[in-house]
Amino acid sequence: MLLIPAIDLKDGQCVRLKQGDMDQATVFSEDPAAMARHWVEQGARRLHLVDLNGAFAGKPRNEAAVKAILAEVGDEIPVQLGGGIRDLGTIERWLDDGLSYVIIGTAAVKDPGFLRDACTAFGGHIIVGLDAKDGKVATDGWSKLSGHEVVDLAKKYEDYGVEGIIYTDIGRDGMLQGINIDATVKLAQSVKIPVIASGGLSNLKDIDHLCAVEEHGVEGVICGRAIYSGDLNFKEAQALADKLGAA
């Protein structure tokens, strides 16, 4: 089970939001590259970046911070980025800059043809971000709810060659209320694409629960507020996941 620290970028700073609300941002660091270094030192094997301004604007907005992170740790571990990625040119630029994966969210829902083209052009580098509220997929920085069911959409993407799906339960994001295990497993069992859980990770019990369903295709979890607030010790959590995975 891969534990992936999240670095959410807003106006060049590392922040955490509650339920995707840009007005409820807590700044955790003004130096995202130093934060990236910290997580690598704590044993992170991959980093998850989100360009929050980009997600709302529909184009990259935190390039300087992302490039600083890549310069700091990009040669050591894979880095993935979501937010504002809506065209092939943007994907190409980010991969050239050193990202290992780009996460396509809104554009995958609104324009499946674009997702298919991206997978064809950049096979092995495309992850889909499906963000859901009560089973329905949200878009545009979570500000709009589509009529699509998560599982139905995921099944559509199966033959595109998507590298993974990050499934976020919006209602739990940043609330430290625990991962929505049932919904995550339901999705993972419905598709052959590896699923990464997100939204609500709060303590070691969640790690226990996730490792218990790893065999169903849940291969990782995004760690957000809990590792910043101190509710979860990242190093300890990854060690537990490794131990349970080896059992």
From Swiss-Prot:
Q: Which reaction does it catalyse?
A: 1-(5-phospho-beta-D-ribosyl)-5-[(5-phospho-beta-D-ribosylamino)methylideneamino]imidazole-4-carboxamide = 5-[(5-phospho-1-deoxy-D-ribulos-1-ylimino)methylamino]-1-(5-phospho-beta-D-ribosyl)imidazole-4-carboxamide
Q: Which GO terms describe its biological process?
A: L-histidine biosynthetic process; L-tryptophan biosynthetic process
- Which compartment or compartments is the protein found in? Cytoplasm
Q: Which Gene3D superfamilies match?
A: Aldolase class I
Q: From the UniProt record, give the pathway where this protein acts.
A: Amino-acid biosynthesis; L-histidine biosynthesis; L-histidine from 5-phospho-alpha-D-ribose 1-diphosphate: step 4/9
**Keywords of this protein's UniProt record, alphabetized?**
Amino-acid biosynthesis, Cytoplasm, Histidine biosynthesis, Isomerase
Question: How would you classify this enzyme at the top EC level?
Answer: isomerase
Pfam families in UniProt = His_biosynth
Q: Which CDD domains match?
A: HisA
Principal location listed in the UniProt entry? cytoplasm
Q: Which residues form the active site?
A: D8 (proton acceptor), D131 (proton donor)
GO molecular function annotations of the record: 1-(5-phosphoribosyl)-5-[(5-phosphoribosylamino)methylideneamino]imidazole-4-carboxamide isomerase activity
Q: Return the EC number.
A: 5.3.1.16
Domain of life, per the record?
Bacteria
Q: Name the InterPro entries on file.
A: Aldolase_TIM (IPR013785), His_biosynth (IPR006062), HisA_bact_arch (IPR006063), Isoase_HisA-like (IPR044524), Isoase_HisA-like_bact (IPR023016), RibuloseP-bd_barrel (IPR011060)
A cellular component term from Gene Ontology for this protein is: cytoplasm
Cross-referenced SUPFAM superfamilies: Ribulose-phoshate binding barrel
Record-linked NCBIfam families: 1-(5-phosphoribosyl)-5-[(5-phosphoribosylamino)methylideneamino]imidazole-4-carboxamide isomerase (TIGR00007), PRK13585.1 (NF010112)
Q: Which family does it belong to?
A: Belongs to the HisA/HisF family.
Q: What is this protein called?
A: 1-(5-phosphoribosyl)-5-[(5-phosphoribosylamino)methylideneamino] imidazole-4-carboxamide isomerase
Q: What gene is this protein a product of?
A: hisA
